[in-house]
C-alpha cells in the first residue's frame, strides 16, 4: 500500500499507541515495520492470533514475557566468525531464558485451545547445553570461577597472594606506625603502598610510587610485597588470557545455533506484539473485526483512535453501495469521518484491532487513496483548486475496483457551479468504475445527485440548533442542510430579515423540510438502536459473569474431589499402619507363629478399601511434574554451590549437567533445582502435619555380639519375625567369631525356619564369618 496514505492518516501515531504494552525490543521493531496487506490469509492469521491470545488471557490474566534486547546484530557477528563479549552473551542468555520460560508456560497451559499460537510456541528451540555454558556469565557481567578449572585455579592463587600482601602490610602498619602519616594502606598505580613521612623515606625499603602535593608524604610499596605484587600482576594477565579463551570457546559452541537463536528472538517478539494488541483491546475496549470477502464494510460505534473523547458512529458500506457523499456545512467533523473510515481499514489490514463494537466488519483493499486537506505547493505556485485537482488526476489514473477512495471537499476552491459540476462528474466516473468512495462537499447540488443516483447515498453530520454546536454524529442516509436561518434567528437577527430571506428560496424549503423529517426519523432510530445496544451489553456482561462463575465452581469441585481422594488415601494408609501395630502387639503377647501373622495381615489388607488411584489426577500430576527435574532445568551443585543446567538423563537415572565449561555426571541427590530453592526463599508454605504413633522403622541388621546365648536366640526370633512382617527380602546378622556358640545357634535357627530361602557368611570386606546374610522366600 502506498506510503502517502499512511502519512495522511498518521498511521505511525496509531502504532505508537501500542508501544507502552510491549516488553521486548524485538516486538517494538516488528510493530514499527507493521504495514497493511491485501493478503486475506495474512489478515485472518493475525485476527486468529489475537482471538487466541484473548482466550489465553481469560485463563492466564497475568501472562507476561521477559524483556529482551535486540540480538540480530549479535547473531550476525557470530555468523561472520567474530567472538562475542560478555555483554553480548548476556543478551543471548536472556533470550534463551525467555524462550525456555515460554516453552514451560505453554507446556503447563490448560483449558485453552490454541492453533496459531501453538505453532509459534512449538517453534521455540531448547538449548540446555548452551544454557549451561552461559551460566558462566552472571548478570553483573562477571565470568564465574566455575567457567573453567584453570580460571578457578588462577583466581585462587590471586586471592592467596592478595591475602599475603594484606598480612604483610598490616604487620608493617603496626611495626612502622611512628614513621607513617596515616595508619592505613593506600593505593597508587594499582599497587598497595604505605603513606610514609618524608623524613623516614629511607627507613622503609621499597619502591616509591607517588609523593603528596605538599611533599610531606611518600607512598612506598615495601620490598616485602613487591615480589607478591608482581606475581599478582602476572596472575591478572593470566586471568585475562583465560577469560578471552573462555569467550572464544563459548562463542564457538554458540556459533552453530546463531540462526536458531535469532529465530527464537523473532518469535518472542511476535508473541510480545500479539500480547500488546490484546492489552490494547483491554485498555481501549477495541475489537477484532470480522473480515468481509466482498469489500463490504460495517463499522459499529467506530471511533478515531487519535481523537480524545471521540464520538462513536456507525458506517455501513454495503456490497452494492459505491459512494457515500457527506454534504452540509464545513464544520461538524466531516473530515474526521473520512479519516476514521480510512484509518480503521488500514489498522485492520495491518492485523491490528479497531476501536469499534463487536459485529463490525471490514473489507480488503489493495490500495487506499485520499485527497484530504490543503496540500498546495508554494514552490509550484499552485492554487488550492489546482493542488487538489492535480492530486485527484493522479489518483484517478491509479484506482481500480480493489481500491478505496477518500475525497475531502471535492470540487472546492473554484466557482461553486463549476466546482459542483466537476464533483458530480468525478463521482459518476468512479461510480461507473465501481470504485468505493467516500466524499465530503458543501455544495447543495450534490444532495440531489445522492438522492437520484443508484448506488450512491447521502450522509451528513448532525448539528444541534439549540446549542448552535455540531454534535459530530454521523447521519447516514440523511443529506446535510444549511442551518443559516436558525442560527441567525438565535443570534438575534430580525425575524423580518430572516423571513424575507427564506421567501427568496422557497423552492428549497420543501427539500429542507424533507431533510428535517429524515433527521428526526434517523435520531429516533438511533435512540432505539442505542437502547438495543445497552441491552446487548448487559446480556454480554451477564453471560461473562455466569461463565466465570461456572468455571470457578468447576475448579472448586475439582479441588474438593482431589482433597477427598487424598484424605481417603491417607485414611487407608493410617488403617494399614494401625493394623501393623495391632499385629505387632498380638505377636508380643501371644504365641502366634510368623506365618500365621503374615496370613492375618493379608486378610486385613483384603478388608481394607482399595487404594485410591491418583495417577490420572491433573493437580497431582502437575505438582509431581513441577518437582521432578528435567532437561533444561537450572540447578545448583550442592557440593560446590555452583549453578549449571541439566543436559541429559542417563539410563541409570543419573544426570549430565553443564556447569560453565565443565560437564558433570550427578545423582539427583547431588543437586537442587534453582526454582525449588527460589520457592523456598520466597515463601514458606504452611504444611498440615498428621502425627502418627508408631514404633521404630524396620531394621535390616541385627547385632548379637556380646549377648548371652538365650538372649541372642530370643532377639534373633523377634528380629526374623519383624523382618517377615515388613516384607524384607534380605537381612544381615552380626554374631562375631568368638567361641562360635552364637554363630552355631544362628545357623541351626535359620535351617529350621521355613521362610528362609538361603543364608551364608558375608564377604570378607563385610565381616566374613563373623556375619551371616539371610535371604527370604518371595
UniProtKB/Swiss-Prot annotation:
Residues annotated for ATP binding in this entry: 328-335
Top-level taxonomic group: Bacteria
Coiled coil location: none
Pfam families for this protein: MSSS, MutS_V, Smr
GO terms of molecular function: ATP binding; ATP hydrolysis activity; ATP-dependent DNA damage sensor activity; endonuclease activity; mismatched DNA binding; ribosomal large subunit binding; rRNA binding
Location of the Smr domain: 702-777
Enzyme class at the top of the EC tree: hydrolase
InterPro entries, A to Z: DNA_mismatch_repair_MutS_C, DNA_mismatch_repair_MutS_core, DNA_mismatch_repair_MutS_sf, MSSS, MutS, MutS2, P-loop_NTPase, Smr_dom
Example GO biological process: rescue of stalled ribosome
Keywords: ATP-binding, DNA-binding, Endonuclease, Hydrolase, Nuclease, Nucleotide-binding, RNA-binding, rRNA-binding
Assigned EC number: 3.1.-.-, 3.6.4.-
PROSITE patterns in UniProt: DNA_MISMATCH_REPAIR_2, SMR
SUPFAM superfamilies cross-referenced by the UniProt entry: DNA repair protein MutS, domain III (SSF48334), P-loop containing nucleoside triphosphate hydrolases (SSF52540), SMR domain-like (SSF160443)
Family to which the UniProt record says this protein belongs: Belongs to the DNA mismatch repair MutS family. MutS2 subfamily.
Function: Endonuclease that is involved in the suppression of homologous recombination and thus may have a key role in the control of bacterial genetic diversity.
Assembly information from the UniProt record: Homodimer. Binds to stalled ribosomes, contacting rRNA.
NCBIfam families, alphabetized: mutS2
Name this polypeptide is given: Endonuclease MutS2
Organism name: Streptococcus pneumoniae (strain Hungary19A-6)
Origin organism lineage: Bacteria, Bacillati, Bacillota, Bacilli, Lactobacillales
Amino acid at each position: 500500500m502506498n506510503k502517502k496514505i499512511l502519512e495522511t492518516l498518521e498511521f505511525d501515531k496509531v502504532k505508537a499507541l501500542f508501544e507502552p504494552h510491549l516488553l521486548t525490543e524485538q516486538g517494538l521493531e516488528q510493530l514499527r515495520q507493521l504495514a497493511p496487506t491485501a493478503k486475506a490469509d495474512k489478515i485472518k492469521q493475525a485476527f486468529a492470533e489475537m482471538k487466541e491470545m484473548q482466550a489465553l488471557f481469560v485463563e492466564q490474566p497475568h501472562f507476561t514475557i521477559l524483556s529482551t534486547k535486540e540480538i540480530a546484530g549479535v547473531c550476525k557477528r557470530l555468523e561472520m566468525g567474530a567472538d562475542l563479549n560478555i555483554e553480548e552473551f548476556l543478551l543471548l542468555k536472556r533470550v534463551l531464558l525467555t524462550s525456555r520460560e515460554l516453552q514451560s508456560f505453554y507446556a503447563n497451559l490448560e483449558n485453552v485451545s490454541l492453533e496459531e499460537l501453538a505453532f509459534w510456541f512449538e517453534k521455540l528451540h531448547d538449548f540446555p547445553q548452551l544454557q549451561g555454558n552461559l551460566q558462566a556469565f552472571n548478570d553483573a557481567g562477571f565470568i564465574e570461577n566455575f567457567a573453567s578449572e584453570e580460571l578457578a585455579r588462577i583466581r585462587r592463587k590471586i586471592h592467596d597472594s592478595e591475602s599475603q600482601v594484606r598480612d604483610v602490610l598490616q604487620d608493617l602498619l603496626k611495626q612502622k606506625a611512628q614513621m607513617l602519616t596515616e595508619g592505613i594502606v593506600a593505593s597508587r598505580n594499582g599497587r598497595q603502598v604505605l603513606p610514609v613521612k618524608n623524613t623516614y623515606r629511607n627507613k622503609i625499603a621499597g619502591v616509591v610510587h607517588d609523593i603528596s602535593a605538599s611533599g610531606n608524604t611518600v607512598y612506598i610499596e615495601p620490598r616485602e610485597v613487591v615480589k607478591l605484587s608482581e606475581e599478582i600482576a602476572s596472575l591478572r594477565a593470566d586471568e585475562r588470557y583465560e577469560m578471552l579463551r573462555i569467550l572464544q570457546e563459548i562463542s564457538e559452541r554458540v556459533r552453530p545455533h546463531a540462526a536458531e537463536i535469532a529465530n527464537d528472538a523473532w518469535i518472542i517478539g511476535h508473541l510480545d506484539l500479539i500480547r500488546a494488541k490484546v492489552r490494547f483491546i483491554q485498555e481501549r475496549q477495541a475489537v477484532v473485526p470480522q473480515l468481509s470477502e466482498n469489500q463490504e464494510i460495517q463499522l459499529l460505534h467506530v471511533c478515531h483512535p487519535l481523537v480524545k473523547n471521540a464520538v462513536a458512529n456507525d458506517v455501513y458500506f454495503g456490497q452494492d453501495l459505491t459512494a457515500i457523499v457527506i454534504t452540509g456545512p464545513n464544520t461538524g467533523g466531516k473530515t474526521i469521518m473520512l479519516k476514521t473510515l480510512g484509518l480503521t481499514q488500514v489498522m485492520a489490514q495491518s492485523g491490528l484491532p479497531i476501536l469499534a463494537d463487536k459485529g463490525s466488519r471490514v473489507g480488503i483493499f489493495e490500495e487506499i487513496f485520499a485527497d484530504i486537506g490543503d496540500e498546495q505547493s508554494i514552490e509550484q505556485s499552485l492554487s488550492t483548486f489546482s493542488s487538489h485537482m492535480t492530486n485527484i488526476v493522479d489518483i484517478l489514473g491509479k484506482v481500480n475496483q480493489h481500491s478505496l477512495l477518500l475525497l475531502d471537499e471535492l470540487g472546492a476552491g473554484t466557482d461553486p457551479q463549476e466546482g459542483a459540476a466537476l464533483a458530480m462528474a468525478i463521482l459518476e466516473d468512479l461510480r461507473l468504475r465501481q470504485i468505493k468512495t467516500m466524499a465530503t462537499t458543501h455544495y447543495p447540488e450534490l444532495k440531489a445527485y445522492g438522492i437520484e443516483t443508484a448506488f450512491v447515498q447521502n450522509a451528513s453530520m448532525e448539528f444541534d440548533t439549540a446549542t448552535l454546536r455540531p454534535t459530530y454524529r454521523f447521519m447516514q442516509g440523511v443529506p446535510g442542510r444549511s442551518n443559516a436561518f436558525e442560527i441567525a434567528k438565535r443570534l438575534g437577527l430580525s425575524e423580518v430579515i430572516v423571513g424575507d430571506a427564506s421567501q427568496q428560496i422557497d423552492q428549497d424549503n420543501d427539500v429542507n423540510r424533507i431533510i428535517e423529517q429524515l433527521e428526526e426519523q434517523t435520531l429516533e432510530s438511533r435512540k432505539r438502536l442505542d437502547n438495543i445496544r445497552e441491552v446487548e451489553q448487559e446480556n454480554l456482561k451477564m453471560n461473562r459473569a455466569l461463565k466465570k462463575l461456572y468455571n470457578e465452581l468447576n475448579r472448586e469441585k475439582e479441588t474438593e474431589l482431589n482433597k477427598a481422594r487424598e484424605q481417603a488415601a491417607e485414611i487407608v494408609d493410617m488403617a494399614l499402619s494401625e493394623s501393623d501395630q495391632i499385629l505387632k502387639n498380638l505377636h508380643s503377647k501371644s504365641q502366634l507363629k510368623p506365618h500365621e501373622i503374615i496370613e492375618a495381615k493379608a486378610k486385613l489388607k483384603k478388608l481394607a478399601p482399595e487404594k485410591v488411584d491418583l495417577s490420572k489426577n491433573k493437580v497431582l500430576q502437575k505438582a509431581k511434574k513441577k518437582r521432578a527435574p528435567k532437561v533444561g532445568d537450572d540447578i545448583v551443585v550442592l557440593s560446590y554451590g555452583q549453578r549449571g543446567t541439566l543436559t541429559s538423563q542417563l539410563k541409570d537415572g543419573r544426570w549430565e549437567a553443564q556447569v560453565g565449561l565443565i560437564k558433570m555426571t550427578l545423582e539427583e541427590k547431588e543437586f537442587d533445582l534453582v526454582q525449588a530453592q527460589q520457592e523456598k526463599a520466597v515463601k514458606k508454605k504452611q504444611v498440615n502435619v498428621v502425627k502418627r504413633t508408631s514404633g521404630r522403622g524396620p531394621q535390616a541388621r541385627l547385632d548379637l555380639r556380646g549377648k548371652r546365648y538365650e538372649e541372642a536366640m530370643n532377639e534373633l526370633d523377634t528380629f526374623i519375625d519383624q523382618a517377615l512382617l515388613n516384607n524384607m527380602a534380605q537381612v544381615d546378622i552380626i554374631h562375631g567369631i568368638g567361641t562360635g556358640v552364637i554363630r552355631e545357634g544362628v545357623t541351626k535357627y535359620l535351617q529350621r525356619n521355613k521362610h528362609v530361602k538361603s543364608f551364608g557368611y558375608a564377604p570378607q570386606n563385610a565381616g566374613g564369618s563373623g556375619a551371616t546374610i539371610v535371604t527370604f522366600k518371595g
